[in-house]
Amino acid sequence: MTIKRHGVGPRLSQAVVHGDTVYLAGMVATDPSADAKGQTQQILKKIDETLAAVGSHKSKILAATVYVANMGIYADMNAAWDAWIDPANTPARATVEARLASPKYLVEIMATAAIQ
C-alpha cells in the first residue's frame, strides 16, 4: 500500500493516507483568541476541509482524541462537538486534559477516518 501525505511541512503532515484510512494531525484553532466553543468550531471546520480534500467526511471518522487545556471547558467543547458530529455515526472518542503547545490554545483534536 502507498502512503500519501497532505499539507506536508518540515515537522508534520496535516493528513496521511494509508490504504482506505486517513490520519489527521492534531488541529488547533486558527484564531486562539476565541473561547473554547469558538476554538472547537474552528477546529471542526478544519477537520471538515481536510477530510473533504482526501475524499472523506465526518460521518466516516473512526476515532478522535480531544485534548483540552482544562476540564472546566469540557461542556463548551462538547457543545460545539455535539452540534457538528453526525449523531448516526459517532466515533470512538477520548477527551484528555493536557498542556497544549501554547497557553492560547484551549482545544486540540486528532482524528482517524475511513475514506471509502
Task: List the predicted regions and their residue ranges.
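N-terminal presequence-like segments and the immediate start of the first folded domain
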Residues: 1-62, 68-116
